[in-house]
Design a protein with these regions (language model features):
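Auxiliary Fe-S-binding modules of radical SAM enzymes
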Residues: 86-203
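Core AdoMet radical
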Residues: 1-60, 69-72, 78, 99-108, ...
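Anion (oxyanion) recognition and catalysis
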Residues: 21, 64, 195
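Structured alpha-helical segments in the cores of large, soluble enzyme domains
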Residues: 55-65, 129-133
Length: 203
């Protein structure tokens, strides 16, 4: 078919990673944060053992040992401090320096959803998120940095200046199944925004 499978199945052990390596060109596992503080009482990851930073870091490291390209990233705006964001970026950088398998870092702003316990959580401000994107580029100057444009429909052009070089998957055929309330921008519009910033758009 010409399709290149990319599976994001969360926290997998080495055997599971090895099995997926046979049929996937790359895998995905969002670190989200390296802060174990966020697994504490009344914190976002209290009841999510699969999102424990140690478990996620183990996946990234095991993928590195198996020479599996992997995409990871941070979720910004779930209660982390700026220092914790920097620490998380450094963790990703160190894993990539050791194994060279991190192919992309996604900087994703948290968008509160109805019917969740964090529905009243304030999303990160544009200035804060722009700062975190800039920090990702400073800490990892040669890394592919992505921001999903549909989660910042009014601001996404500014992330080019902050250092991103990838818009991620934008589909003219399907919705964003993870964030169905956030429609994709028109690809022609994204291309125009990219070209106006002085860069070539490659789809």
């Amino acid at each position: 078919t010409g399709m290149l499978p990319h599976t994001n199945a969360g926290t997998l052990n080495s055997d599971e990673l090895s099995l997926l390596k046979k049929s996937n060109v790359s895998l995905g596992c969002m670190l989200e944060t390296s802060s174990e503080r966020l697994t504490g009482k009344n914190m976002p990851h209290e009841f999510a053992p699969s999102k424990n930073p140690r478990a996620r870091i183990r996946v990234l490291e095991n993928a590195g040992k198996l020479k599996i390209p992997i995409t990871t990233g941070l979720l910004i705006g779930i209660g982390e401090t700026l220092e914790e964001i920097v620490d998380s970026l450094i963790v990703i950088r160190e894993i990539n320096q050791k194994y060279g398998n991190i192919q992309e870092v996604i900087m994703q702003n948290h968008v509160p959803k109805d019917n969740t316990k964090m529905k009243s959580f304030l999303p990160p401000t544009h200035d804060l998120f722009l700062l975190t994107v800039s920090l990702a580029r400073i800490i990892m100057p040669h890394m592919n940095i992505q921001v999903p444009p549909n989660l910042s429909p009014n601001h996404y052009p500014t992330y080019i200046e902050a250092g991103i070089n990838d818009w991620g998957g934008i589909s003219p055929l399907t919705i964003d199944f993870v964030n169905p309330e956030s429609p994709w921008p028109d690809i022609k519009e994204v291309k125009q925004v990219t070209n106006m910033a002085g860069y070539n758009f490659r789809g």
